[in-house]
């Protein structure tokens, strides 16, 4: 066999080219050349959790087709050949897979040989074979061979006979009480619990705050009330169907393996008993042939058969005096249709939800919160656990309570967090946003939603996804101290979520909780701490039985337990105060940083201004470097002082000259007047005239001095005159020194134009 040999195969009725790689088969569809991306990631030797994250972040964001039903090897996420080549190249397996990617069958040429050691049966063929085998069995009896090929639910008193059938992939097969319609392989993944009839009366409406006491239960520490999925046989792990989206079934954890007797959960040999969590993870957990039985007043669940009616499972509100109200009747009719939809095969396709289910009757509270199964689940519980967002929103508008509780105190948020449906449909963030007000609610054992998620272990993809969503979204609407309280919440046995992770040896969840504020020193009722459990300080028997021996590692034990209780209560407050101090310091530090940045910007602006001034100064002084600026400025200052002294001297000389001219002119006038009056006699009147003239002369001389000073000021302070000269020079292209000589010409020109 050549290492590059391409084979032909047929899986679930689809023709493919198959390439045998050391890690498994790599497939390419013949019809459209699409390649299974999950196979490529397997060829790159990624573990399943890593493959799931890569598919989420890098593959399903582009063109893809997800195949979950049919033959196991064919399942996975299929992408076009071009995207497959890029994906293989990114993870360095392109050269290994190139024979398959480059292979093209020439028209008219022979098809590649069939893949060896494979049976390529289509899905329809396998279904027909199962139907044939089932038809050969008498009614009410199923052979061991048939039961090994059909995964249908039966009550727990029917025992499976081991060793009668070959080992199958997936969950253990179960015997079947009655022959039912054959269903495809993809619809027979989950075990189907039998559904007992209900005897709920109007006086048994679920209370929002039921009285759950510590003495009301006798279950062992940290025992998780398992769903039908969690009740699978422990030797079966989660199904490895390529992309990790099929199932979250896992064996019971260490802390959940010890179950004490409980009257509510007790199984009898004569009566079928429902699981402790009747809500299935998919509608296929119900047999289509099993209808709902008529209502009975018996408190013991009855086995249903195919002849019972559908509507009678719904508990109807009745009274011996008054008939059912119109709201009650409308609610019962709607819930009957809703239950029919939940147990049908159409729940995976939200685009085909009947419109009548999206428009429930209004104003039907509290009837819309009627229990629809013996474990007191409401329709809202079902819708949230199924991950069907449109129905969740419709029920919410109709008045459904987000705090409805089942008989073990589980809210719809907890129910949606313990099944994988919200993960498969990617509706958990939206449903959590609707139910976020109940994130702090506890069940009958004081466990919150984080307890329930962590107990499922991190190898379950949906559990990792749910915990990431919860821890990220609660930061958007609640203060940190409440988050710390939620993460360190202790159940009735004193176990925090970190105890669960430590007991399961779940390093991923353990580290994630530590990063979000979980405390390693919290003691449970047996005195065990998460740190001691994860470090192997306690034996397995101690952890399982809730007992412990003397611990040599702990020297300072705090007794009585009230001291530890007070410490545990104070720790979140201390943490909150420290975080407030840190926030205050951070705010002050940020304020100082902003001030420093502002000062740096101011200094930078000033430096820029200084540089600009220096450049202009160098240009004005006709210099190349700033080193000589001080010398040049000193020289210019000395010249200015010298010029100012010369101006003052010239000013005095000019004043003296003007004074001398004025004195000579006055003397001339005086001499002329003196000659005219010589020889004339003067009387008293003329003497008075002379005095008046002298006074007038004095005033005129004073005015003359003022005018003289004004002339000097105009001549010496000529800054405005220089500006005018410069403005005229720029407007007429005449040199500044020639402006005075051209003033008459300019004036005449302007007068003519005016």
Curated annotation (Swiss-Prot):
Residues 6-112 form the HTH APSES-type domain. MBF contains SWI6 and MBP1. It holds the Pfam family Ank. Residues 147-162, 273-289 have a biased composition (Low complexity). Residues 257-272 have a biased composition (Basic and acidic residues). It is found in: Nucleus. Keywords: Activator, ANK repeat, DNA-binding, Nucleus, Repeat, Transcription, Transcription regulation. It comes from Kluyveromyces lactis (strain ATCC 8585 / CBS 2359 / DSM 70799 / NBRC 1267 / NRRL Y-1140 / WM37). The gene is MBP1. Residues 37-58 bind DNA. SMART domains: ANK (SM00248), KilA-N (SM01252). Binds to MCB elements (Mlu I cell cycle box) found in the promoter of most DNA synthesis genes. Transcriptional activation by MBF has an important role in the transition from G1 to S phase. It may have a dual role in that it behaves as an activator of transcription at the G1-S boundary and as a repressor during other stages of the cell cycle. Residues 105-215, 239-301 are annotated as: Disordered. Its main location: nucleus. GO terms for cellular component: MBF transcription complex; SBF transcription complex. Residues 177-187, 203-215, 290-301 have a biased composition (Polar residues). Signal peptide: none annotated. This is Transcription factor MBP1. ANK repeats lie at residues 375-404, 493-522.
């Amino acid at each position: 066999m050549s290492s590059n040999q391409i084979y032909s195969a047929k899986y679930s009725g689809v023709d493919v080219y198959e390439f045998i790689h050391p890690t498994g088969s790599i497939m390419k569809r013949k019809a459209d050349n699409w390649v299974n991306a999950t196979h490529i990631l397997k060829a790159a030797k990624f573990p399943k959790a890593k493959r799931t994250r890569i598919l989420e972040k890098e593959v399903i964001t582009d063109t893809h087709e997800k195949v979950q039903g049919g033959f196991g090897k064919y399942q996975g996420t299929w992408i076009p050949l071009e995207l497959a080549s890029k994906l293989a190249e990114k993870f360095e397996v392109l050269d290994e897979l190139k024979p398959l990617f480059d292979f093209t069958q020439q028209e008219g040429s022979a098809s590649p040989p069939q893949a060896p050691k494979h049976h390529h049966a289509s899905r329809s063929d396998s279904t027909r074979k199962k139907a044939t085998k089932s038809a050969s069995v008498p009614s009410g009896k199923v052979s061991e061979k048939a039961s090994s090929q059909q995964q249908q639910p039966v009550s727990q008193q029917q025992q499976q006979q081991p060793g009668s059938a070959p080992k199958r992939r997936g969950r253990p097969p179960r015997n079947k009480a009655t022959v039912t319609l054959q269903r495809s392989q993809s619809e027979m993944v989950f075990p189907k619990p039998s559904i007992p009839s209900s005897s709920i009366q109007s006086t048994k409406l679920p209370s929002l705050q039921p009285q759950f006491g510590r003495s009301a239960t006798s279950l062992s520490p940290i025992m998780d009330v398992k769903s039908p999925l969690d009740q699978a046989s422990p030797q079966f792990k989660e199904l490895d169907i390529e992309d990790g989206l099929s199932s979250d079934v896992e064996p019971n954890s260490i802390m959940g393996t010890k179950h004490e007797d409980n009257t509510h959960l007790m199984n009898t040999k004569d009566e079928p008993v429902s699981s402790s969590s009747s809500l299935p993870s998919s509608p296929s957990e119900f047999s289509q042939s099993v209808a709902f039985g008529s209502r009975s007043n018996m408190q013991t669940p009855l086995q249903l058969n195919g002849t019972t009616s559908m509507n009678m499972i719904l508990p109807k509100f009745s009274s011996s005096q008054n008939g059912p109200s119109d709201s009650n009747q409308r609610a019962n009719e709607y819930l009957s249709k809703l239950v029919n939809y939940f147990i049908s095969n159409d729940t995976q396709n939200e685009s085909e939800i009947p419109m009548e289910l999206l428009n429930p009757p209004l104003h039907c509270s509290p009837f819309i919160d009627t229990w629809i199964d013996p474990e007191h689940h409401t329709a809202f519980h079902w819708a949230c656990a199924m991950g069907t967002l449109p129905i969740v929103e419709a029920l919410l508008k109709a008045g459904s309570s987000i705090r409805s509780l089942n008989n073990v105190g589980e809210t719809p948020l907890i129910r949606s967090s313990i099944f994988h449906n919200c993960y498969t449909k990617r509706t958990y963030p939206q449903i959590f946003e609707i139910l976020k007000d109940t994130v702090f609610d506890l069940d009958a054992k004081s466990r919150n939603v984080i307890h329930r998620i962590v107990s499922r272990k991190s190898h379950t993809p949906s559990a990792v996804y749910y915990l990431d969503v919860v821890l990220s979204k609660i930061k958007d609407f609640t203060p940190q101290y409440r988050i710390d309280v939620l993460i360190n919440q202790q159940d009735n046995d004193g176990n925090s979520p970190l105890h669960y992770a430590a007991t399961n040896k779940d390093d991923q969840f353990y580290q994630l909780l530590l990063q979000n504020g979980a405390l390693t020193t919290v003691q449970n009722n047996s005195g065990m701490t998460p740190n001691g459990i994860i470090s192997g300080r306690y034996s397995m028997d101690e952890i399982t039985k809730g007992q412990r021996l003397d611990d040599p590692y702990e020297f300072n034990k705090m007794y009585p337990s009230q001291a530890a209780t007070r410490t545990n209560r104070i720790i979140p407050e201390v943490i909150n105060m420290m975080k407030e101090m840190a926030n205050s310091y951070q705010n002050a530090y940020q304020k100082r940083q902003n001030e420093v940045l502002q000062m740096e910007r101011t200094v930078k602006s000033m430096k820029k201004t200084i540089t600009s001034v220096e450049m202009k100064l160098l240009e004005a002084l006709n210099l190349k470097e700033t080193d000589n600026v001080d010398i040049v400025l000193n020289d210019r200052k000395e010249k200015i002082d010298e010029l100012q002294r010369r101006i003052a001297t010239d000013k005095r000389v000019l004043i003296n000259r003007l004074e001398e001219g004025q004195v000579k002119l006055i003397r001339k006038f005086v001499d002329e007047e003196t000659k005219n009056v010589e020889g004339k006699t003067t009387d008293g009147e003329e003497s008075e005239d002379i005095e008046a003239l002298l006074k007038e002369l004095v005033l005129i001389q004073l005015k003359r001095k003022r005018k003289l000073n004004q002339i000097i000021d105009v001549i010496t302070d000529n800054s405005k005159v220089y500006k005018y000269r410069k403005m005229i020079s720029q407007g007429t292209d005449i040199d500044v020194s020639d402006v005075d000589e051209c003033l008459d010409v300019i004036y005449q020109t302007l007068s003519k134009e005016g």
